[in-house]
Amino acid sequence: PAFAETCPQYLLLSLEDNMLNDDMTDKGWEGAKYVFTPPLREKRNQPKLWEGLRKDNLQVVSTDHCPFCFEDQKALGKNDFTKIPNGGPGIENRLQLLHHHGVGQGNFSINRFVELVSSAPARIFGMYPKKGVLAAGSDADLVLWDPGALYTISAATHHMRVDYSMFEGFKVKGNARDVYSRGELIVSKGEFIGKPGRGEYLRREARGGAWK
């Protein structure tokens, strides 16, 4: 079988956005933040991506998280576009954006949201049913989600080690409140309280549940 993904930037950003309409000079250098592969397309393509998520033509929403700082690393390409490091940050805000614009705006159901961010990736990567499901014998990995929590995305408050956000100023409704990993509370009321070094190696099947 074949599997496909998209990312929040392709669902929510487009060539028509103002920050991309510059000439890559000192005055209009913001566009360097959005140099990644594949490049952004026209806004008219976005409804088809949402439709693909609803119909399971797209099985996963990832981020292609590849952060380069704007002030020093992206600036390497100021005199030569081809030297702009390719990639952008996004892993921290994936669930917030997908819940707000997916569930909150009626693009898919809450059940489909869970499938896209949990059970489908676990199957594809050969970790199901240890991950991606609440069942006897599975890891007790839980996210308690507050659908009414309001949050404004900003580089000033995010935890990623990068000096900008592709979604700066986006207002979202819905956020993780508590997170349990293997039954242990590691995020409480939005604050990380886990112990360093508690991770475990996950042996994956070469052909996991998605292939069966």
Regions found by a protein language model. Name each.
Residues 32-44, 84-89, 165-171:
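A short acidic, glycine-rich active-site loop
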Residues 201-212:
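Short, solvent-exposed cationic patches
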Residues 36-51, 124-126:
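Active-site glycine- and acidic-residue-rich loops that bind
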Residues 2-5, 61-63:
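Hydrophobic faces of well-ordered beta-strands that scaffold small-molecule active sites
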Residues 75-80, 86, 136-202:
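C-terminal cap of metal-dependent C-N hydrolases
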Residues 11-21:
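Catalytic core of soluble alpha/beta enzymes
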Residues 21-34, 55, 60-61, 67-148:
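His/Asp/Glu-enriched, well-ordered alpha-helical/loop segment
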Residues 7-11, 64-66:
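Active-site beta-loop-alpha junctions enriched in small/polar residues
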